[in-house]
Amino acid sequence: MKTKAAIKKIREAAEKAGLEFEQFERKGHTGIRVGSKKTTIGRHTETPDGMAEKIYRQLQDELGQGWWR
């Protein structure tokens, strides 16, 4: 999965849920905050599907269980 597509999917889900979305750059990763949850995603062109799912799972407390499916 393209990293930009993963971030876009998270941003759209946050907007749909009425939660604040923030994207910020760190040294080698992009930080993402949805509501009160923070996570990072590597700054690569591609993010492996398994890694993207782990990132999505980290945000399910805010966005709801299985929101990415």
Model-derived features: where do they sit?
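Basic nucleic-acid-binding interfaces
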Residues: M1-R26, R33-R69
